[in-house]
């Protein structure tokens, strides 16, 4: 089985998360996408982070697709960093082929992630274009360091079968939603009480 992993705070989850997942399912020919709702992002201020249970329920409501599974795995296995989550999944679920899914905004700062080179060496990565982040992402230290492992976009369906490091930059999905833009200054979610 080919599984895409989309990690994040999902604070709040929104239709772009769903659209990215469905886009990845199709373009990467995945069987499932797992949303890994993190207890907290080490690179972000977590003071306005809603309670994990509320984010999980909201994510389930937004996902609304049997191929998208919402998980709080990181809180269960007590991992803080993506590399630890990936290592645990690969060790426990050896028969699955994982692909890490991230937006271009995350590629732009991927070099700041704990053990980012090891992440790239453990699982193939699909980067979803997020204008206007495209140029910044593709000029980032991580993109430059991993440039020789980049697949042409027309080979995206082969990514899950490639040994890491391997990555692809997927274009064509034009959404400009972000969780940051859907939060009020006090951290509450816009459109909710």
From Swiss-Prot:
PANTHER family for the chain: NICOTINATE-NUCLEOTIDE ADENYLYLTRANSFERASE-RELATED, PHOSPHOPANTETHEINE ADENYLYLTRANSFERASE
Function description: Catalyzes the reversible adenylation of nicotinate mononucleotide (NaMN) to nicotinic acid adenine dinucleotide (NaAD).
Family that this chain belongs to: Belongs to the NadD family.
Record carries keyword Transcription: no
InterPro entries, per the entry: Cyt_trans-like, NadD/NMNAT, Rossmann-like_a/b/a_fold
Name of the protein in question: Probable nicotinate-nucleotide adenylyltransferase
Molecular function (Gene Ontology), one example: nicotinate-nucleotide adenylyltransferase activity
EC number(s) per entry: 2.7.7.18
Reactions catalysed: nicotinate beta-D-ribonucleotide + ATP + H(+) = deamido-NAD(+) + diphosphate
Alphabetic keyword roster: ATP-binding, NAD, Nucleotide-binding, Nucleotidyltransferase, Pyridine nucleotide biosynthesis, Transferase
SUPFAM superfamilies per UniProt: Nucleotidylyl transferase
Pathway, per record: Cofactor biosynthesis; NAD(+) biosynthesis; deamido-NAD(+) from nicotinate D-ribonucleotide: step 1/1
Entry-linked Pfam families: CTP_transf_like
Gene Ontology BP annotations: NAD biosynthetic process
Gene: nadD
Species this protein is from: Bradyrhizobium diazoefficiens (strain JCM 10833 / BCRC 13528 / IAM 13628 / NBRC 14792 / USDA 110)
